[in-house]
């Protein structure tokens, strides 16, 4: 009986790290993707505001807020969602001449 109890204890101890790793993977998969627009020396602030309104449907106030964040902080998150949608958003921003990347949300 002592051997059975020892084996059960070892099995339980070995299962714990796998459960933690699996949980970490699930949490990483649950994090949405985001599109980040970066400051650049080319585009005018008015144009960036216009693009945010046109591509994402933001109000002038929200688009201006995001544009100022890009201008003052160097970047701003302009959209979030699935990886496919963020890839699409990045392509549209590139087509408009803006610098944009995508990443997992923090």
Swiss-Prot record:
Matching Pfam families: ClpS
BP terms from Gene Ontology: protein catabolic process; proteolysis
Q: Report the transmembrane regions from the record.
A: none
Known Gene3D superfamilies for this protein?
A: 3.30.1390.10
Subunit-structure text:
Binds to the N-terminal domain of the chaperone ClpA.
As for what it does, the entry says: Involved in the modulation of the specificity of the ClpAP-mediated ATP-dependent protein degradation.
The family this protein is said to belong to: Belongs to the ClpS family.
Protein name per its UniProtKB record? ATP-dependent Clp protease adapter protein ClpS
Q: Which source organism?
A: Nocardia farcinica (strain IFM 10152)
Quote the gene name from the UniProt entry: clpS
């Amino acid at each position: 009986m002592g051997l059975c109890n020892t084996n059960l204890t070892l099995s339980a101890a070995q299962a714990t790290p796998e459960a933690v790793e699996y949980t970490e993977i699930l949490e990483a998969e649950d994090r949405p993707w985001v599109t980040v627009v970066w400051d650049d020396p080319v585009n005018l602030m008015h144009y960036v505001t216009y693009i945010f309104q046109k591509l994402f449907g933001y109000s002038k106030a929200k688009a201006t807020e995001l544009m100022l964040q890009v201008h003052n902080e160097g970047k701003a998150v302009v959209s979030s969602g699935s990886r496919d949608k963020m890839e699409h958003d990045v392509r549209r921003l590139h087509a408009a001449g803006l610098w944009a990347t995508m990443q997992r949300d923090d």
